[in-house]
Structures are given as structure tokens and as C-alpha cells.
Regions:
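Short, hydrophobic/aliphatic alpha-helical segments
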Residues: 14, 19-34, 75-88, 176-191
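Active/ligand-binding-proximal structured segments within catalytic/core domains
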Residues: 33-49, 73-124
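Terminal appendage regions of diverse proteins
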Residues: 205, 211-303
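Histidine-centered active-site/metal-ligand motif
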Residues: 64-70, 94, 98, 191, ...
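Conserved nucleotide-binding/hydrolysis modules and their immediate coupling elements
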Residues: 1-76
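Functional cores that coordinate and move charged inorganic groups
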Residues: 86, 106-219
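Short beta-strand-to-loop capping motifs
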Residues: 68-70, 126-130, 225-227, 303
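Ordered, soluble secondary-structure elements with a strong preference for glycine-centered loop motifs
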Residues: 37-41, 90-95, 130-137, 193, ...
Length: 303
């Protein structure tokens, strides 16, 4: 939580993610904020201003703009609360991306051209047309080794004209950026210009799971990953599915695939036999109709 003051409040509309009818509300600027505005591939934070939910946080120049649906009085002192679960999830995914990016370039020379922190999974776009299964497995082993080594993650701010900035990984600053440049360091591995939120030690990531690759745009490869609590959640969901299949198929997890293949073969055979029987029935009905002495030109059969 954080105490601050309202600087301005003006009427505005918010377009919901995924489309839909615009929401009427207010854009609020505070003296300072603990809520992160979306940027750098990372979604925004959520929280409360007093008891008013913050539905979106965006950046306008140096200011964070909070969208709410109730007006707030400029000059009023307010208590700002952060949705920590959402923030920590984003910290794990974002620091995980920095780690994967650094190791992928170190091991294979694959540079990261963009990334996306999704609701269910995150994707890193690598500047390579393909990535072998062996490379994915080696990369996963290496990033998890670094997590177990408890490597510190630190943040420093440099003046915009500091020569040290030239040695930092960067995809450039926004055109309206003012003030010092923020750099996130993974000790001995990476220095990256970044505005996002991060863990203070790689051990906070717990684990990283690389889910595989997908074909990207313009001869690039998308590497899909989970970090931290998302790995545990994925394991929990997989275990629940495994338990349900064990109950339905009446066999152990190691036999699920073969059991499903047998069921698919049985269904195909049943469908084939059913079609054959339907054709036989149709032939018999047609013969019966033709054998009737007073049959008409039009015959209708409904079942």
C-alpha cells in the first residue's frame, strides 16, 4: 500500500481488451504511484485507489494514468493498494524472459526481437528460422541451473548520456522518454534496458518450463514458456487431467495414449459398420417399395 495525492481527474472512456462497448470513467493522475503502466511487453498492474478499482494503467509521457469509474477529487490524499498476485506473476514472467533471452543468445547466438507476456503463457520471438528439440532442452536445463544458483537481479538508473548505456542490451527508448535510463542486471549474465518489474533474485522464479516452439513471422521462431507459479499451476492442471483420464480409461497414466488410440480405432470401425448397415437397410426398403403393386411415383420414409 502507498499514500499519495490526486493531481488530476478527467472524464474518459476505456475500450475493454478484446473489444466490446466502451466503459465510461475517469483518467486519474497521482503524485506518485506503485502501479506499473503497461509497457515493454509487460501488462499493467491492477489495484485500488481507496476502495475504487483501477481497471487500466497506461503511460502518458512521464505520468502513469489510472482509469477508474468513479471521480476522485484533485488534491485529495488517497491510499493506493496493489494486486500483489498479479504483480508477482508478471515479475516472474518478465525476469524469466530476460534470463531466457540472455542464455539463448549466449548458447546459440539467437537474439530476441520481441516478446509477449500472455495471460496463460508467454512467447519470446527469436531471430532464427528454427530451433531443434535438443536446443530447447539444453536451454531449459541451463536457465534452471541459473535459478538454482540464486543469481542476484538488481536495478540501476543511469543518466541518459552515460557511456555505460552503450554496453546495455536495448531495443531503444520511447520517443517521449525523459529522465534517467533504467537498467536491469542479472549478475554476470545480462544488462538490459527495461522499465518493467522484476524479482530480486533468480531463485524467486522457482522454475522455468519451455513448452516448445512455433513458427513465427518473417523467418523467426516463437519460443513458448512458463515461469514460477505458472509452472506449478500447469502441473496441477495436468495432474487433474491425468486423474480424470485414469478414472475414465481404467488404466495407468503410462497407458493413456494407447488406450485412446484403441478407442479411436473402435469408433472408426463402429462408424464404418454403421454406414454399411444403413446402406443395407436402404436397399431393403427400396426393394420393399418396388414390390408393392400400387406404389406411386413419390415415396417418403420418415424415422
Amino acid at each position: 500500500q502507498f499514500v499519495t495525492k490526486v493531481v488530476s481527474c478527467r472524464a474518459a472512456e476505456l475500450r475493454p481488451e478484446g473489444g466490446g462497448e466502451a466503459l465510461s470513467g475517469f483518467q486519474v493522475v497521482l503524485e506518485d504511484t506503485i502501479l506499473f503502466p503497461e509497457g515493454g511487453g509487460q501488462p499493467d498492474d491492477r489495484g485500488l485507489i481507496g476502495d475504487v478499482p483501477v481497471l487500466r494503467v497506461t503511460r502518458r509521457g512521464p505520468d502513469a494514468v489510472h482509469f477508474v469509474q468513479q471521480p476522485l477529487q484533485p488534491g485529495a490524499e488517497v491510499l493506493l493498494s496493489l494486486d500483489w498476485n498479479r504483480r508477482f506473476d508478471h515479475m516472474q514472467q518478465h525476469s524469466g524472459q530476460h534470463l531466457i533471452t540472455a542464455i539463448a543468445e549466449q548458447m546459440f547466438g539467437f537474439k530476441t526481437t520481441s516478446w509477449e507476456l500472455g495471460r496463460q503463457r508467454s512467447v519470446i520471438e527469436l531471430d532464427t528460422p528454427s530451433m531443434s528439440t535438443e536446443q530447447v532442452e539444453a536451454l531449459e536445463r541451463r536457465v534452471n541451473e541459473k535459478i538454482r544458483e540464486r543469481v542476484p537481479v538488481t536495478v540501476r538508473e543511469l543518466p541518459a548520456d552515460d557511456p555505460a548505456i552503450e554496453t546495455v542490451r536495448s531495443r531503444g527508448l520511447p520517443g517521449d522518454h525523459v529522465g534517467p535510463v533504467r537498467v536491469v542486471d542479472i549478475e554476470g549474465l545480462d544488462s538490459n534496458m527495461c522499465c518493467g518489474t522484476h524479482v530480486s533474485n533468480l531463485s524467486d522464479l522457482q522454475a522455468i518450463k519451455l513448452l516448445g516452439t512455433e513458427k513465427g513471422k518473417k523467418n523467426k521462431t516463437n519460443l513458448v514458456f512458463l515461469a514460477g507459479n505458472r509452472v506449478l499451476k500447469s502441473i496441477e492442471q495436468s495432474h487433474s487431467t491425468e486423474k480424470a483420464l485414469t478414472s475414465l480409461l481404467k488404466n495407468g497414466p503410462g497407458e493413456h495414449v494407447e488406450a485412446v488410440k484403441r478407442l479411436q480405432s473402435s469408433v472408426k470401425l463402429l462408424q464404418k459398420n454403421n454406414l454399411t448397415l444403413l446402406r443395407d437397410v436402404a436397399v431393403l426398403i427400396a426393394r420393399d417399395f418396388k414390390s408393392q403393386p400400387d406404389h406411386r411415383q413419390l415415396f417418403v420414409l420418415h424415422r
